[in-house]
């Protein structure tokens, strides 16, 4: 894609973040700064694609944008998993999930965001009070008879996260 077309595409998505009541003021301010910056590198990297699940899960640098880890991308992924669980386990009396996290920046916030979205979708949530290692989370899913679980872990190569 030509650079100007890519910039225009990214600016269009960024504008939707700036103009929607769905996003908090701090996020909107950061996005506005990217749009107004003559150097479009950060804007492009933040909005040129949507984070996708890979072998390591949902991975990315923290910050505003569709290609970043933030409460909005975590929320969208959680809503997708909620939809899947409600569709595929609709005959169960109660669908349940385990939500865990580690000590990285915003990990607890992301875990609470996910827990709230699961709950809003009628899914019972077992949210660990504190950080836990992945094997403990895996054990909890089986021990509690949950249909799924998510663990918000540090996986970004960025030292700023």
Predicted regions and their residues:
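Short, well-ordered strand-loop elements centered on a beta-strand within folded domains, enriched
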Residues: 10-13, 17, 156
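Conserved small/polar residues in nucleotide/adenosyl-binding loops
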Residues: 154-161
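Short hydrophobic/aromatic residue motifs in ordered secondary structure
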Residues: 57-59, 127, 161
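N-terminal small/polar loop signature for handling phosphorylated ligands or for N-terminal nucleophile
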Residues: 98-152
